[in-house]
């Protein structure tokens, strides 16, 4: 009964999160803010989860922002939480065989208490860090936990993140229903509300950088905030607060931002921001904001051909094949989200300006796959950042899978990509032999790695997909 109730809560929250994203409404707006470059409302975006015009969600009182840069109060950090019972695991979808144990990472949980919007709060903070401090890179990837209870920023970059020695921080900013349903005794005292979100993100982010926080034994050089889908709405809603909230030393709390699975037009900020719309966001034209390098407009838009709104490759615990009618895509979303994170971290930490990329081409013809994308002869997107899955294709990648008639999941299937295999006879005409195909993929990977569009840490993992193709 407990597990059934927990599953129902997760499904309900996921549905709420999807509705928020689909309608471009803010999850936790505390002050009027715009999604546009000049502070206007969000435009376009499909399922991107950007800020909607008007700021505060109906019924949620806005907390007015300071008019000048203001230091936030540091909240109180608990000792490491070790019980009762097991920690709620928000990162169940890591690359098989490449989890925290493989990379010798520790997962530490804390409770954080403070005051936000005039009310006390107590929330959860999870730190995933190298067991050996000497491996820490000095860089922290922080995220607001997705409303459905997922640490997607960590999951979607975990191989790159852990192989590089970065630390991942996960901050609970909204409802505690998911961890509470998983372990009532452990999480019974958590108390927070959506109208406290921005201040919680600021206060806990400042705590992470401080010498009284969970990383007091190491030196944090830079910290970025990542969001995907509904949690990217949390991120974009935070941006006006970013412009005024500071650490007690009056430094930036977050040095860069990465909203993903998000196609809205996002306001300009004073630190680098890389946005990653997916093929789902091309059902409506994704943001037309242009890349920029100048101070106050450090922006990149990275659109990866073949990428879906949701990872369906390593998401078996949440989205098994049996839930959807069509074959789930094996496209390695993580490998390419990590490319964007790699460039963002170099930008904020070393000042290395990232390359600009072509956008996915648009023909406004919905009679092909229902999107506005221009498609090649195999049915895959033209333009965008390329990869072997679309350059040496063995399948067509189409957004919006269909839920299975029995025990299906309409929400997650609809947010995933499915594949249609290219017939083996056609593959033989295209590549001649399997060995020749593998050589082509290997050569293409090396080209992309040299150009900065694929990371060497994923080379063998991607090449293994090519070696598994049979024709």
Go through the PLM ranges and name each one:
Residues 20-33:
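Signal peptide processing junction and immediate N-terminal pro/mature segment
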Residues 31-471:
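C-terminal His-loop and adjacent cap/lid subdomain of alpha/beta-hydrolase
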Residues 10-22:
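Bacterial N-terminal signal peptides
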Residues 1-6:
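N-terminal secretory signal peptides that target proteins for export/translocation
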Residues 8-11, 27-29, 159-162:
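Hydrophobic transmembrane signal anchors and adjacent membrane-proximal interface regions, especially
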